[in-house]
């Protein structure tokens, strides 16, 4: 019904809060075909658009669906998203050229061929701060070098020096002006400017929640 009655759909948000991963909604039939050519914003929650064990084929229905959405500007995934990041790497290089805002896993982000055009990036699932986490953030920001707004949350482990993650953001996120960080508990720093001058000097907005 949604496909037939809304042929010019521009914004679609399907969120399924409270559902366990095993009870995710099967939406595969909704995202196969050439409908909604003017779609600009797509937000999906705990949905199944494919299986993580699907064959990594160029012809995956959801990937084919995304590849012809030339006007898509915002793409957001939350909850349990079952499609493997290797599928996103199969997107044609000239697809999603208008995409400017992405929310989802780092693996999905770095697999997007259009990541270089992103201006806003959000990692909704908390990252556990380990020794490799700064490298992970650096890799993500190098894949999306034009990002101006970054939102990410961290789970701090006891004794970890949280300032290292700020140094990584300052180095790799050369254009970031809006930084929104959430920590599971009190981080080991208080002010950005004295500690990371090159980051604090260019930020317009900096929020730390704990």
What kind of region is each of these model predictions?
Residues 1-210:
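Leucine-rich repeat
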């Amino acid at each position: 019904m949604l496909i037939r009655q809304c042929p010019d759909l521009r914004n679609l948000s399907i969120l399924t809060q409270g559902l366990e991963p095993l009870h995710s909604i099967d939406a595969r039939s909704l995202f196969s075909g050439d409908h909604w050519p003017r779609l600009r914003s797509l937000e999906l929650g705990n949905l199944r658009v494919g299986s993580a064990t699907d064959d990594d084929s160029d012809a995956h229905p959801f990937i084919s669906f995304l590849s012809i959405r030339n006007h898509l500007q915002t793409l957001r995934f939350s909850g349990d998203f079952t499609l493997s990041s290797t599928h996103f790497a199969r997107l044609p290089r000239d697809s999603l050229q208008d995409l400017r805002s992405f929310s989802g896993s780092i693996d999905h982000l770095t697999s997007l061929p259009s990541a270089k055009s992103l201006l806003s990036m959000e990692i909704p699932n908390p990252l556990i701060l380990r020794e490799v986490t700064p490298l992970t953030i650096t890799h993500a920001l190098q894949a999306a070098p034009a990002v101006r707004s970054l939102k990410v949350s961290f789970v701090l482990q006891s004794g970890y020096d949280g300032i290292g993650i700020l140094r990584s953001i300052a180095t790799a996120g050369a254009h970031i002006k809006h930084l929104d960080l959430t920590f599971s508990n009190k981080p080991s720093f208080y002010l950005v400017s004295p500690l990371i001058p090159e980051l604090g000097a260019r930020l317009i907005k900096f929020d730390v929640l704990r």
